[in-house]
Amino acid sequence: MKPKITIIIPCYNSEKWIEQCAMSCLNQTYESVEVIAVDNESSDGTVAILNDIKNNNPELIISSAKNIYPNCWDEAREEGFRLMTGDYVITIGSDDYIDLEYVDKCMSVILSSPKNIKAMQTPIQGIRQQGEEFVSTGIIQHSYKSKEQFKKLCLTKCPVNTPSVIYSSELYHRGLLETKPKEYGGAADYDLYCNLIDNDVFIYPFPQWLGFYYRWHPEQPTWNVHKESRM
């Protein structure tokens, strides 16, 4: 049997998107997938929608976490880590979605060299609403060939597509996926990547887009972080 992958979906006021996200994860063609949705104290219909989905998909695990830190998903992700039973784990935003073969394609790459690939990221396809339709905003990808090159990129930007990263669960059990939202807020992932590279964990940047859709919209935490940084 192939290694299990856990997909964690942190949710906060996601009633517009959560069904598309959750179903894209539940319907993956990869044979061993665990999906955990963690609500972060939503005040809209997110939880009701998740419960409706679970009625037809009992394998969906639903949990909750306190919403302590603004503009980040760390509390919900930590709850997902606590519950996960997968050999690998990915955290997908509740406003994003993936092609049905995304996990299968990613795991084929990882399992081609499991001792060397403990973490992997992929390019993401940006999408934005335009009227009644969603249009592409282009592919976002990062390229580096060594840990040293990665460290240099970290001096000027975050060279990681955060929601696309698949980690070996071994990293969590070694304490290497811990984040510090109290200190860094929405930039806690950036600190995580610097800590990983300092511990010789290379996030392999797969060069081809495999089916990840990243939704741009004014309500997302990324926009809020940018707004606050300009104040």
Positions of the model-derived regions?
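Short loop->beta transition adjacent to catalytic acidic/histidine clusters or analogous donor-positioning motifs
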Residues: 2-5, 26-37, 45, 58-61
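Conserved nucleotide-sugar donor-binding catalytic segment
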Residues: 144-230
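A conserved acidic beta->alpha catalytic loop
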Residues: 39-48, 67-69, 93
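Conserved donor NDP-sugar-binding/catalytic core segment of glycosyltransferases
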Residues: 101-136
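Short, well-formed alpha-helical segments that are part of the catalytic scaffolds
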Residues: 14-27
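Glycine-rich, basic loop-to-helix element that forms the pyrophosphate-binding segment
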Residues: 65-84
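Short aromatic/hydrophobic "clamp" motif used to bind/position activated sugar donors
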Residues: 89
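Acidic helix N-cap motif at the loop->helix transition within catalytic regions
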Residues: 19, 44-53, 97, 101
